[in-house]
């Protein structure tokens, strides 16, 4: 396992934050988020480009390091540990939309088991992988080589997986087994060669999906029999939606737009405004995760190629 201590980096970050604004808190472009700071600077040369993250109970962050095919854990004191590395596809494999093998969404089950999506460009590797607390990662559901599994969420014993290439949402039993297409509504698709369905969450009996190419946030009800209901566009004009998370206030969400270098606060009525920009340290934000009023943003620097990082902030209720 790879261990990296970030203590010195975190100390330097704290100093920078203390100089940025009175009281040691950086100023965001909008008062919905305050105390914006860099939780950790990551190493681009080492492949540390986080695509998704989830927050553990102790405040540690589980990160998927996209093209490095790694899953890593960042502790509150700045230690970065590699939990697993997924197997590489054969040399020369062309992954749809991306070109290279790519670890995407991550979710943690109540028993601590982690699940991730993996787009590998082969029938033998693409799908949903389980990372047990002890032992090697194992694929629990196969998806076709043409799929690009991306966002991931758990709801009532089922894993829901967005597919950016096929414009679909797959459903997989938590215990593993056959993946089935749960929804393939036209609203989930992107233009040919573009990312469609991307970030995915479940809330209030519905699967919510961001469409990267269309800049929309979608809501798909889960029927009493588990089938997908009619897709509704809850917000549009958002730019390239990569990932999002709910704030805990109604259906308000924070949305990361990747090349756009912005985080948007989207209200339940579909209105939205920018709350973070590159001026706050964003470097192509790929994911947002909240625990209470703590907000974490993963920055992969896919396009800026500079300073991938994790930003932290505090959510101001009702802003």
Located regions from the model:
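Beta-propeller domains
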Residues: 63-85
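Short loop/turn segments immediately following the C-termini of beta-strands
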Residues: 66, 119-121, 164-165, 174, ...
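Beta-propeller fold detector
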Residues: 35-42, 80-88, 138-142, 179-186, ...
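Asp-box/WD-like beta-propeller blade repeats and closely related beta-sheet repeat scaffolds
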Residues: 123-156
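Beta-rich, blade/repeat-based domains predominating
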Residues: 43-60, 89-114, 118, 143-160, ...
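A short loop-to-beta-strand structural motif that recurs across blades of beta-propeller domains
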Residues: 70-72, 126-129, 168-171, 216-218, ...
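Secretory targeting and sorting signals
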Residues: 1-29
């Amino acid at each position: 396992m790879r261990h990296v201590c970030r203590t010195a980096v975190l100390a330097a970050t704290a100093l920078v934050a203390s100089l940025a604004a009175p009281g040691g808190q950086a100023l965001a472009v909008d008062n919905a988020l305050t105390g914006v700071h860099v939780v950790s600077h990551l190493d681009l040369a080492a492949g540390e480009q986080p695509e998704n993250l989830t927050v553990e109970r102790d405040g540690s962050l589980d990160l998927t390091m996209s093209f490095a095919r790694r899953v890593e854990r960042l502790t509150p004191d700045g230690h970065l540990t590699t939990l697993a590395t997924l197997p590489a596809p054969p040399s020369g494999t062309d992954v749809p939309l991306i070109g290279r093998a790519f670890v995407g969404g991550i979710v943690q089950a109540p028993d601590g088991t982690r699940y991730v999506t993996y787009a590998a460009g082969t029938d033998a590797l693409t799908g949903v992988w389980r990372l047990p607390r002890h032992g090697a990662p194992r694929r629990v559901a196969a998806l076709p080589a043409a799929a690009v599994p991306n966002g991931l969420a758990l709801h009532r014993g089922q894993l829901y997986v967005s597919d950016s290439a096929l414009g679909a949402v797959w459903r997989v039993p938590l215990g593993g087994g056959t993946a089935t297409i749960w929804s393939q509504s036209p609203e989930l698709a992107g233009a040919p060669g573009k990312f469609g369905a991307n970030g995915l969450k479940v809330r209030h009996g519905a699967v919510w999906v961001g469409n990267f190419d269309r800049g929309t946030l979608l809501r798909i009800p889960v029927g009493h029999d588990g089938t997908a209901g009619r897709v509704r566009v809850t917000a549009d004009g958002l730019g390239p939606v990569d990932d999002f998370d709910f704030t805990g206030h109604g259906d308000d969400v924070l949305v990361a737009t990747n090349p756009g270098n912005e985080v948007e606060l989207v209200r339940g009525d579909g209105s939205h405004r920018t709350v973070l920009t590159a001026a706050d340290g964003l470097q192509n934000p790929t994911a947002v995760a909240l625990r209470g009023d703590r907000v974490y943003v993963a920055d992969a620097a896919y396009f800026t190629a500079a300073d991938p990082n994790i930003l932290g902030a505090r959510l101001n209720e009702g802003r």
